[in-house]
């Protein structure tokens, strides 16, 4: 038996409510800026404009596509968000290659919104735990002596920042960044940087005095992680990492509840 296409003549005569509903709804028309964006994107992907090459001026694009300046500017802004062009003041747009950072940054708005949903932070914390668990296992098996030396240096900066919360947070992020760099995968780095940015931005504001004990606990847990990596023991490194991140999550949840009660 042939499958009926929703847009053929038989489907149009169908008495179903779905068919009637479809006939009453006109297809949405694309904005001029979207049409310009799509055409320019195809031209870039066909290499009609090479990487580093400048696109025609706004005036030339207006004439070529027979559209106004706002449509051209909206199209170029959309291409910039996709990482396909760079736009500097006073210069024509220049073709660029999307990076891992560009890809992840496209998700930033949605991720930050998701973090405000019930359970959103817990879901992202679980994602971070799964992700960094793989990173430390890889580090224990594959990290070079030079990479372990970088972890050791990050630990030293950690220890020097214990009494300054702002500095400690930066040194904490740097420690985990060094871990994320070990596989040499730029996508891992982009994901890791974004994850930490999103989670840190979602943390509650708490007095500095509340964080001093937490800083010292985190530092001691970092030491255990690095020791396990030095010993080339992926299971031990994984357990140490999970202990650390579960401790961090529990601390911030407790601080968040305490902060809410004080309001």
Curated annotation (Swiss-Prot):
Annotated region of DNA binding: 58-77
SUPFAM superfamilies in the cross-refs: GntR ligand-binding domain-like, Winged helix' DNA-binding domain
A biological process from GO: negative regulation of DNA-templated transcription
Pfam families per UniProt: FCD (PF07729), GntR (PF00392)
Cross-referenced NCBIfam families: PRK03837.1 (NF003011)
Function: Transcriptional repressor that controls expression of the genes required for the catabolism of sialic acids.
Name of the featured protein: HTH-type transcriptional repressor NanR
Protein source organism: Salmonella typhimurium (strain LT2 / SGSC1412 / ATCC 700720)
